[in-house]
């Protein structure tokens, strides 16, 4: 799934999500993206951490959309990327970022055999 979101300042950000997204996310940030989004019992402290997760996810999906060499991503590159945005840019657009990711996880195949 590929999409473009518009940040409040009018800046467009391309995002792409695919089967590799959660693995690339874990590779760089050491967190299990599937577990984060599947855990519905979050307390207030965990919800604050989710804001960081959304920004990190936006970085991974933007890197995929831009065709970057995903094996070379680093925390320094993440911080450099962040310097191009305002502190709240991705938090304000959190639902859009999450929707791009989640739309890539939906099953789109249809059953080949009809149930009896």
Give the location of each predicted region.
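Charged interaction scaffolds used for protein-protein
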Residues: 1-11, 23, 27, 31-48, ...
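Short hydrophobic-aromatic micro-motifs
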Residues: 13-15
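Residue-level signal for threonine
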Residues: 18
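Short, hydrophobic/amphipathic alpha-helical patches that form generic packing surfaces
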Residues: 52-64, 96
């Amino acid at each position: 799934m590929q999409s473009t979101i518009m940040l409040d300042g009018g800046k467009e950000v391309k995002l792409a999500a695919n089967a590799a997204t959660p693995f690339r996310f874990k590779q760089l940030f050491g967190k299990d993206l599937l577990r984060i989004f599947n855990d519905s019992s979050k307390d207030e402290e965990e919800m604050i951490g989710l804001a960081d997760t959304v920004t990190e996810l936006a970085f991974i999906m933007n890197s995929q959309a831009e065709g970057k060499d995903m094996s070379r991503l680093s925390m320094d590159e993440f911080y450099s990327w962040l310097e191009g945005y305002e502190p709240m840019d991705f938090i304000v657009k959190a639902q859009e970022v999450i929707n791009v990711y989640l739309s890539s996880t939906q099953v789109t195949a249809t059953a080949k055999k009809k149930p009896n």
